[in-house]
Swiss-Prot record:
This is Ribosome maturation factor RimM. The keyword Chaperone applies. It comes from the Bacteria. NCBIfam families: 16S_RimM. GO terms for biological process: ribosomal small subunit biogenesis; rRNA processing. It is found in: Cytoplasm. It comes from Yersinia pestis (strain Pestoides F). One of its GO terms (cellular component) is ribosome. HAMAP family: Ribosome_mat_RimM. An accessory protein needed during the final step in the assembly of 30S ribosomal subunit, possibly for assembly of the head region. Essential for efficient processing of 16S rRNA. May be needed both before and after RbfA during the maturation of 16S rRNA. It has affinity for free ribosomal 30S subunits but not for 70S ribosomes. The lineage of its organism: Bacteria, Pseudomonadati, Pseudomonadota, Gammaproteobacteria, Enterobacterales.
Amino acid sequence: MSKQLNPAVPDQPIVLGKMGSTYGIRGWLRVFSSTENAESIFDYQPWFIQQAGKWQHVELEDWKRHSQDLIIKVKGVDDREAANLLTNCEIIVDSTQLPALEEDDYYWKDLMGCQVVTTTGYELGKIIDMMETGSNDVMLVKANLKDAFGMKERLVPFLHGQVIKKVDLTAQRVEVDWDPGF
């Protein structure tokens, strides 16, 4: 199944998905993909997992869509018991494999921790999560401890031009046109 490959471990690891429950008795597992198109997770190889603090390379033998699920067969994992050991393992790749983005497009991982500030200079807090809502992405912003409006968290739509006025990843800052009381 896997072997220690210290020289090849990701320098810039990013989680692209998670291995789910076993499927059948021959070592297949369900996969939950975090990529925009679920099947795109298979475009990024090699996969790594961490178990007991150690990196392990995971080589795919096969994958397929089964009903609504994606299922995988990991090389060397041939029964339910062996597959069960991989349940809930995060699928990790090196983020240098991700394609370059166009202007005004951002990977969520790059927005995490950015300070969100209104156009009037009010600091709303830091981005702690992103959510996909169907119509647009939404930032979950953890408010500063002494927020003047008593907020703990805010949901701010990630609408470039409309709400998002400027993103400076170097300064870890996102400027928004947003009412701090909302």
